[in-house]
Structure formats: C-alpha cells, structure tokens
C-alpha cells in the first residue's frame, strides 16, 4: 500500500492562535525545518502554542480519567486540524535549574556515571597519611599475625569508639553483658566494672579486649576463631597490641590505613554524591560554599563608635540587651561604647564578634536592675546567623544577607565532597579534579586513560568509560566544550541550558519524535554553528522531525525546509509568506529572503566614533578564567565584546565591570570578581543593565506599567469631568488596589487555576471578561474609550489616540520607535519574548532625560530578533550613543559586531583556553589582524558583495 501524503508530512489546518490568521502549513516529516520571521510575527505561536500545545494535549488524553480531572481547564489550541503529529518534545531557552545543587554533571547524568566509575574502579588513599588503603581477608590477617608476632604475648582488640566525647556508661554495660571483662580506654587497659563511666566532655578511644594469647603456629585454630570474633565486634576492623612494647597495629576487612587506623566503608556511588549525606562535605552540606560575615559590611566606618552606629547591623545605640552585652565585654578592656571601633583592642573586637566562652556579667547599673545578672554571649556573628536561620520570614533573611558574603568552603575547598570521597583516585585524579576539567579536557583524559589501568581495573571501567565518552561527545558536538561538570546550572545562559538538553536528547536515541527548539544558536559563536547544525541533522537522521524557531542565516541555509511567518509583526503578521526549500526562498521577495540574498543589509557605518576622549580602564581582571586582563572602554562609543563561547566575555562584563559600577553608583551588595583597580569612574554618572529578563513575574506587569506611562494615563482619566463628578482618585483606575478593579479576579483579568503537578493555568475572569475593572470604572471614557480599552490598544493605535496628549505620546512613541508598535499597552509581560522585554526596557531608558554620561550594558540583545529587528535595535543603540552615552554589547551576531565603533575580542578558546584579551580596536583592525576566530568571520562580513556572492553560489549548487 502506498504512503499517503500525511504519512510524509505534518499538516496544520486553520491555525488561529494569538495573531495567526487561519494559516495552513505543511512540514515534511524526518526533516530539519526552520520557522523564521520578525519578532512577534507568530513563529512561537505556530511552533509552541499550536504544534507543541496540541502534542501535549493529545499526550494528556492518554492519562487516566482521575489524572485528567486536574487538567479540565487546559484549552485545545485554536486550530482546525493537525495530522501526522508525532510525540512532541520541546527544548526551550530557559535556565535549567535554580537549585544551587544542580550542576552540568547532574543535569546530563554524566556525574552519575562518574560516581559509578569511582565506586567500582578507583583506588582509596588515606586522607591522613596519603598512603594507599589496604584490606585483608580473615585468612590473610591470621597469616600476618602469625608471621609478625610468633612467640609474642598479644591482646586482640576490637575498636568501638574513635575520638568521640561521651560517658559511655551504656556501652560498658553492653560489653559486660557480652562477657568481655577488659577494655582499653585511651591507651590504658582497664577492667570493665559495673557503673563504669568516663568524662563526657573529653574525646575518648575505646577498644574491647576479645582475647589475650601467646601467638604460636600450633594454636592457629584458636587464633583464627579469636580474629573472627574480634573483627565481628569491631565492625571489620581489629587491633593487635604487643604486650612487650605496647605498640598497636591495625588489621581490617575494610579499606584501612594501617598507620592511622582510619577505615572507609565499601565504596558505593552515593559516597561520591554531594547530594547525599554519605558523600557531602559536612561543613557546606555539599554546596561548595559557605556564608560568612563580611567585616567591611558590618563595620563600614571604623572611625565611628558603636554608640554612633559603627556596627551596621545594630545601628545607633538603643536600650537593648545586645548593647548591654557589648558594653560589658568592652568594660573588661577598659573601653566603652563611645570608643571609636578603630581604637578597640583586637581581643575586644574578637569577643564582640564571636562571643566568649564563659558567662558574661551584666552590671546592675547597665541593665537598670537591682542586681547584676549573668548571660551567655554568643557574639554578633551568631546574632546575624540566627536572624538568617530564623522563622521570621524572608525580610529577616534579607537583612542578614546584606552583612554576609559567600566564600569557598574552607573544608572541601569548593569540591562539595567529604574528605573520604576526595581520597579516592582514578588514574591519579580525584572525582573533583575530573569534574573541574573542561568537557574537552575531560574527553581527552578519558580517551587515553585505559592504557594507564591494570587488566582488572580496565575490565571494570571499560563499559562505564564507553558511556561517559558517548555523553561527553554529545556535549562537544553542540559547542559546550568549555563547560565543566562542576559548573552550577544556575550560572548557565538560556542558550547553554538548551544545548545541554539537546545533547541529552541526542544521547537518548529516540526515534519518530517531533523536536521543537527555540533558537538553539543563542550564545554560540559562528565557529561553533556548524557543530550545532550537524547535531540537529544527527537528530533528524535518527528518524525524527526537527522544527527550529531560528533567525540564524547559517541555520536557515542548512535546513531542509523553511517557513517564513510575516509579513510584519503583531496584527500585521500571522501569515505564511513562504514555505519551501532554502534555495527557493532566496529567489523570493520576502523580508527574510532580502536579508539572506543581500538585497537588504545592515549597513556598515562610513566612519567609526572615536569617543569623547575619556576612557574607563579596568585593570587586572582575573575572575573565573580571566588571566589578569586589562581592558580599555572608550566612553561615548558603541563597544562590542566578542569571542567564542566561554572565552570570558560575561565574566569580564557581567561579573566584574557591572558589579563594580553598581557598587560605585548604587551601593549594590553584589560583589565583583577579582580585579586590581578601575580608572575613569569620574567620567560616568550611572550604569544601566538592559537584559532580556521578564518585565515582571506575574500577568499584572505590562509595558504601560513598566514605562510609567500608565500613571499618566490614570491621571488623564481622573481629570475627566465624569471622574470628577464621581469623586474618583487615581487609585480608582489602578487594577492593583481595591475600588476600581474587579474584585472577583482582584484586577488580574484572569483567574489562576492551580494544576498541582503542572504549571498554573490562567483563564479569563468570568465577571469582567479580562477587562480587570468593575462596571462603574469602565463608564468613565476619554474620546469614547474606557481605560480597559486603552490597555487593549496596540502601541501604534495608542500613538494615534494620544497624539494631542504630549506627556503620554512621548513615552509610547518611543515604544513605537524601537519596533514594538504591534504589542498592546496592557499586554501581560509573561507573554512577551526576551527580545520584546529588552526593547521595552530600552524604550523606557530612551524616554528618560540623561546627562550623556551613562553606560548601558546589554548581553546578547539580538536573541529572538530577526534581521529587520536587529536593524531597528541598532538604530536605537546608535541614538543612545549619539547622545554621548556609552553602550557595551556582548554579542556573537556579526551584524552587530560590524557596526560597533570599538571591539574587545576575548579568547582564543573557551574555558581554560580562554580568558585572554586578543584584540581591542576597530572592527576593521580585528578583521585584518588575523587574531582569533571572530576576526576571520568578520573579515568575510566586511568584504563588499560577500553575501550576494555566497547566495549565488548556494542557489547554483542547489539547482544542479
């Protein structure tokens, strides 16, 4: 029987989700399909809100009736029909986890295999002496005793307690009940008497004497029985005490250090897990860092006295116990609360911070009591810690955090594991050392490790190594060679998280699945793009359909099929303007194809700005992989920070420069990474980081509230005659307070349906039908429109509507100028893409008056942006620079890099191979320098007619 058309295709009929205009789309199965178009044109509506949503709905229909009870409010996508749909997996750009315990190794499950490798094939060493641990069979122990102690009188001891406090009365009773009469306590042989107990506040070593005998070969049978009994009592460990010289020697069926007597449990995978009590460092509980008091934050000015507020957590003096306690401490050092902190003896300060061992006397005259009284004083550090750990809520924890800093755990030095787990070595390396290697370095190490192993360990490790190598290879293939397994998931970008999930999916070897990816090229240098594309093709070649929402030129040209959504964004989009092969697309006149074939382009400026003559200079930056770099930022220019993924761009800008500026201007508590100094701050008056994070966390936030124009709109409505007659105040037109809002949905416009084991779902309020306000409020109208009608307008409509209201027009016109004319004034921030959120923030900054001395920092602002969106964005950034400001952009996109005035190129590689400053200067200079990978790609981009020639070659090769 021949295959029908739908067997070969996924067919979508009549899709009307969001702005989609009843579109029909055919996607060939088992192919790599790219969906492209302007930001807001409807790409995600088609890929995620239609295809993925319908796939999820069909999956949920397979649940039991009980499980489906929780899902009744999930609406089916507004689409007539979808045929040929496979099981769907969505791989979106979002941070993998906010859990500080989650790492690249745990997310990919590679660390699980590493733990298994160490449990089965690693060798144990003593964390005391560094010597290799040993373990023996009972027969071997008997033979060793016969050899070493022939003719000697010995005691066979079973260790019960090693260096622990307690009186051990119950333990001695148990020993006596078992029939043992002699014990060895702290090296002294003693009779186990009734009621025997020790000093409970001292550490003790306790062994029970199981047998006393003279070692003779003819009595080997008795020795064998005694050794077996001793090992049983000692949990697999025993000691032999030579009566002649009082020397002891350890023997064990477990892993043991004969010199120190420490023994390890038989290793299991959980012993190497920092999320397990058996493996985690006891100091930091497996986090790798601890919170400690920051002296500089607690004592910001040591010239002040404690009474004047010299201790920031306490503030100025008040009649409270903590001040009485400190006053009593200082009195012992002939000081008082009026003494400047810098003049206090170090010993006194130490007691103020850390407390004192003995009880503290509070004099009657200090406490205003009739008699002196005594208290335990734990010190200021403990006081802050108690507030951090208290049940008083987030406010008290935030209060405590402002006086603390995070530092590497002093016990495990960031390895997260206890000393026993860290004492195992595989091919000479601890598990932490392997986890800290770059993926590329780890892959090379494991590739060559088998030749270093003996035959026994090689046989054990072979299959585990094979699995490890396979999974590491998938990470290499998606351009993540610079990451390490120990890298916290919290620090990964959205693009990195997505590529990790992509690598995991390739490793799962699933077939006949529909994968939908959201811009997997985010954060990826041009150099690594080919590897990513090959990974997607590998996923396709397994027998899957791969649908990618993407703007990257290389990805589009490498696709089997392209769907272009447009022609513009918002209400002006939602149509399929092209679907077919890339070669066919290049010969059309869509906006996308014009940028691909060179008919349109983001023009290279004729001249580059030199700046205002002032330079911000960062000296000796050495955080993460930075190698003591010194970087110049010419003020009054557009600066591009470039380099391969993991080369140190974000470390330099987001983790060093931005926190320095934020601390200087806003007293931010965020600490910058290590650097020597910064010069030129006097030429800057503020810093603004414009990122792609949501405008708010709930549906309440929107462009109108974020930009501040909503306050002006409410003021306009309050001053209308109808509002004045009714006595309405500005709060009447707020959906956040009682009075004018709909009380059924509390002004949300939606009701939240808790989905238990799924994310919450928002459904329109049945009372106000999503308008947020009550009936009375909506009766107040301006030019025939209620305030709810205004919030429902697009920016373009609002610009026309408020053309005669200057203070409102100014703010919304800027939103139109940055290309957001299609979004609604009251559109929930949760529905805006990252690129749209960023442009709302940019518009807000543009609408403000500035002094022309502001630094704007943007991290990959082209995420989610089409070529035309990038052109609009760059026009906005150029406007900011033309006003005298400085714009610093971390970017891989060559359209941004080529229009910058000044480039800072980091590299040469990612991870440990990066962190160097390769070049700083003009784009032309980098292109001609021959340094690094960015210059090579930039040179081709700056070559006239490069795009047109590349397009002609592509079309000709596909027409043959």
Language model features: what each stretch is:
Residues 1-960:
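Conserved phosphate-binding elements of NTP-dependent enzyme cores
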């Amino acid at each position: 029987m021949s295959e029908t058309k739908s067997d070969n295709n996924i067919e979508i009929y009549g899709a009307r989700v969001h702005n989609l205009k009843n579109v029909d789309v055919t996607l060939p199965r088992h192919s790599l399909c790219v969906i492209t178009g302007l930001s807001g044109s409807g790409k995600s509506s088609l890929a995620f809100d239609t295809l993925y949503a319908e796939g999820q709905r069909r999956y949920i229909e397979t649940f039991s009736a009980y499980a489906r009870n929780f899902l009744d409010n999930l609406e089916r996508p507004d689409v007539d029909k979808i045929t040929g749909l496979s099981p769907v997996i969505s791989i979106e750009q979002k941070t993998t986890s906010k859990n500080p315990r989650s790492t690249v190794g745990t997310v990919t499950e590679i660390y699980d295999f590493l733990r298994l490798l160490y449990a089965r094939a690693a060798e144990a060493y003593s964390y005391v002496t560094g010597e290799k641990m040993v373990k023996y069979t009972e027969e071997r122990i008997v033979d060793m005793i016969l050899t070493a102690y022939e003719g000697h009188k010995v005691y066979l001891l079973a260790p019960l307690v090693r260096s622990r406090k307690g009186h051990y009365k119950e333990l001695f009773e148990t020993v006596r009940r078992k029939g043992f009469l002699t014990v060895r306590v702290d090296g002294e042989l003693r009779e186990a008497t009734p009621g025997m107990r020790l000093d409970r506040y001292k550490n003790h070593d306790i062994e029970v004497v199981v047998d006393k005998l003279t070692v003779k070969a003819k009595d080997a049978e008795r020795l064998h029985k005694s050794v077996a009994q001793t090992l049983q009592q000692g949990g697999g460990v025993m000691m032999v005490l030579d009566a002649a010289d009082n020397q002891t020697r350890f023997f064990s069926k477990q892993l043991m250090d004969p010199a120190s007597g420490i023994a390890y449990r038989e290793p299991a995978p959980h012993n190497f897990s920092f999320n397990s009590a058996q493996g985690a460092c006891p100091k930091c509980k497996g986090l790798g860092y601890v919170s400690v008091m920051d002296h500089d934050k607690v004592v910001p000015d040591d010239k002040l006295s404690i009474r004047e507020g010299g201790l920031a957590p306490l503030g100025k003096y008040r009649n409270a116990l903590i001040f009485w306690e400190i006053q009593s401490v200082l009195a012992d050092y002939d000081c008082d609360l009026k003494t400047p902190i810098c003049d206090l003896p170090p010993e006194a300060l130490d007691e103020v911070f850390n407390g004192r061992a003995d009880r503290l006397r509070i004099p009657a005259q200090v406490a205003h009591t009739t008699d002196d009284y005594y208290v335990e004083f734990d010190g200021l550090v403990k006081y802050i810690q108690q507030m951090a750990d208290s049940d008083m809520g987030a406010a008290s924890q935030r209060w405590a955090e402002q006086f603390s800093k995070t530092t590497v755990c002093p016990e495990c030095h960031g390895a997260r594991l206890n000393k026993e787990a860290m004492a195992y070595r595989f091919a000479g390396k601890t598990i932490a050392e392997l986890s800290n290697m770059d993926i590329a370095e780890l892959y090379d190490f494991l590739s060559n490790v088998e030749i270093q192993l003996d035959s026994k360990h090689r046989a054990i490790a072979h299959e585990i190594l094979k699995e490890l190598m396979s999974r590491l290879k998938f990470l290499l293939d998606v351009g993540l060679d610079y990451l390490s397994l120990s890298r916290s998931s919290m620090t990964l970008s959205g693009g990195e998280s997505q590529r990790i999930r992509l690598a995991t999916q390739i490793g799962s070897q699933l077939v006949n699945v529909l994968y939908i990816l959201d811009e997997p090229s985010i954060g990826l240098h041009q150099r690594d793009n080919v590897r990513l594309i090959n990974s997607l093709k590998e996923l396709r070649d397994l027998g899957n359909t791969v649908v990618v929402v993407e703007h990257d030129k290389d990805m589009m040209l490498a696709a089997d099929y392209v769907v272009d959504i447009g022609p513009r964004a918002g209400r002006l989009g939602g149509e399929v303007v092209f679907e077919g092969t890339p070669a066919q697309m290049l010969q059309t006149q869509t906006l996308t194809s014009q940028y691909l074939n060179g008919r349109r382009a983001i023009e290279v400026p004729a001249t580059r700005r030199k700046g205002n003559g002032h330079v911000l200079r960062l000296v000796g930056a050495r955080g993460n992989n930075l190698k003591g770099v010194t970087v110049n930022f010419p003020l009054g220019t557009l600066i591009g920070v470039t380099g391969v993924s993991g080369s140190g761009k974000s470390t330099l800008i987001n983790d060093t420069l931005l926190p320095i500026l934020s601390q200087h201007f806003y007293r931010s508590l965020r600490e910058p990474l290590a650097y020597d100094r910064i010069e030129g701050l006097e030429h800057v008056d503020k810093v603004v980081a414009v990122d792609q994070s949501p405008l708010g966390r709930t549906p309440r936030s929107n462009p109108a509230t974020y930009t501040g124009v909503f306050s002006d709109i409410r003021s306009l409505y309050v001053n209308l005659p109808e509002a004045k007659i009714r006595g309405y105040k500005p709060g009447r037109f707020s959906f956040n307070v009682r009075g004018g809002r709909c009380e059924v949905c509390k002004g949300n416009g939606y009701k939240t349906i808790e989905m238990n084991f799924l994310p919450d779902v928002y459904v329109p309020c049945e009372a106000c039908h999503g308008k947020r306000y009550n009936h009375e409020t909506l009766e107040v109208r301006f030019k025939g429109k209620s305030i709810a009608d205004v919030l429902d307008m697009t920016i373009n409509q609002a610009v026309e509507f408020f053309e005669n209201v200057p203070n409102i027009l100014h703010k919304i016109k800027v939103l139109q100028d940055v290309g957001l004319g299609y979004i609604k004034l009251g559109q929930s921030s949760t529905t805006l893409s990252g690129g749209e959120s960023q442009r709302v923030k940019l518009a807000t900054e543009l609408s403000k008056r500035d002094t022309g001395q502001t630094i704007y920092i943007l991290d990959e602002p082209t995420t989610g942006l089409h070529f035309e969106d990038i052109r609009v964005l760059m026009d906005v950034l150029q406007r900011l620079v033309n006003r005298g400001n400085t714009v610093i952009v971390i970017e891989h996109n060559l359209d941004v890099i080529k229009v910058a005035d000044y480039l800072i190129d980091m590299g040469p590689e990612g991870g440990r191979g990066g962190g160097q400053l390769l070049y700083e200067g003009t784009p032309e200079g980098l292109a001609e320098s021959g340094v690094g990978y960015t210059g090579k790609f930039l040179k081709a981009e700056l070559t006239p007619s490069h795009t047109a020639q590349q397009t002609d070659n592509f079309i000709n090769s596909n027409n043959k």
